Amino acid sequence: MSPNPTRGSMEQAFSGRAAEPPTMAALKARETKFLREHELCRLATASKDAKPHVVPVIYTLDGGDVVVAVDYKTRKLKNLRENPRVALVVDEYRPNRGLMLEGDCEIIERGPEYLRLLKILFERFEFYRKNPWGEGESPILKIRPTKAVMW
């Protein structure tokens, strides 16, 4: 067994196969505060053959989960269908502060949970309120952190 349950081999991290079932990392108050102060992160996904892909996305929080809306025809969504493991970074150049999260992503496309998360996104982002969508039009990613590193 690995000494740190959130760590595994690089192959396991990119293959979507965990050595052990990941556990949710409870975000500390300062990590949650930092995330709430920002709205843009860089989301990293990897395909089933471990080809990495990183893109900027806007996000909001739902408790300890990170919530992101995506389009259907994106590489990140294709990757997530093959491999639910993600990493994301929120950072500031000056002062040099940041937060890196690793976690597992659930793709939500319909149903009560979708509508609940959609409401949270609409409340946070005026752009989404002005350009609304509904079930089946744009998947929502719910990312459950399993590791957090702040600097």
What name fits each language-model region?
Residues A13-T45:
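Short, conserved active-site entrance elements at the starts or edges of catalytic domains
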Residues Y72, D91-Y93, P145:
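Short secondary-structure boundary segments
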Residues T32-K33, I58, K78, N131-W133:
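Short secondary-structure boundary/capping segments
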Residues S2-A26, P95-W151:
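Charged, gly/pro-rich active-site loop segments
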Residues E39-L40, R85, E126, A148:
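Generic structural signal for secondary-structure transition and capping sites
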Residues T74-K76:
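Short, surface-exposed beta-strand-loop junctions and turns on beta-sheet-rich folds
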Residues L35-R36, R81-E82, F122:
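Alpha-helix boundary recognition
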Residues H38-D71, L80, A87-V90, M100:
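Short beta-strand segments
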